[in-house]
């Protein structure tokens, strides 16, 4: 599972990105930049790009630069192999203009990345054998409806990993989206409009990628904090709007019972917690729609106090209280809770809570 959220930095957005990047502990995480976006070229381009790279390196980010055959001459260099030393880069992401032989030669000297969607099994094997750190990165897709299908992402990721390569992908941001479309920059079309935490967890749990970048310039501090907790503690935070009487459940770590059915997440520890207080009285026994958090009341006998997260619509039951709901943009997270895995309920962001009113 990835242990970081990489970021994407754009020369045209850099001044606006500096403050939030400075506030985010880099810790050696990678940052993705592009050094061949034609619309950014102009007077002073090389100097501005150098200054950006110096600043990012000084903040502790490892810079992975997307380059083409025209990049080196822009900086007065003869060869792409000179770029890391000249600009303080960690590695190069090579566009499709580089031959396999050129890519293998570079891989022997530095970390490189290639296009995960176009690399064949034979090419992947050759590249993985050429150097110690070779990554395949899936593209991000600015235009709605053009992102990858789940099946293609799974199949290509498995193939590349089997050949010995690491595989990275992109999730959308939730602040300062990248123009001109401002529709998010995900790899997977299903993630367009999803919260960064939800998209990150989905890629990590269901697709097994080795690294994840945010494609858009901005990720809110709330999302960064939840992703960081998932990476470091291996506890999945699930933003839930709980009824006031049950907000003491926020932050408690639960385990999904190993025998949970597909349509429910059963909170393994919940009945033990409930024994510390009086039995739950019937209240709010409404329809149990997908995303509903429920607690069995005293009418369910020994099950009183059991908490469940509902993954498929169920009818109302007088023995079951509705005590909360997963915030809409995070419902993808429910499917990321696997049998035996740990998770916790957290308050939604202030913006999410306001939008729900």
Feature locations, PLM:
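Active-site beta->alpha loop and helix N-cap motifs at the rims of alpha/beta catalytic domains
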Residues: 2-133
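N-terminal start-of-chain detector that recognizes signal peptides
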Residues: 4, 65, 108, 140, ...
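Residues in well-ordered beta-strands of folded domains
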Residues: 8, 137, 239, 308-310
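Short secondary-structure transition/capping segments
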Residues: 8-9, 75-87, 105-119, 160-165, ...
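A broad, low-specificity signal for short, low-complexity segments enriched in glycine/proline
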Residues: 53-56, 75-77, 172-175, 266-273
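Electropositive, surface-exposed helix/loop patches at the edges of structured domains
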Residues: 65-81, 96-104, 152-155, 205-215, ...
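Catalytic alpha/beta core domains of metabolic enzymes, predominantly
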Residues: 117-120, 124-248
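C-terminal functional modules
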Residues: 244-357
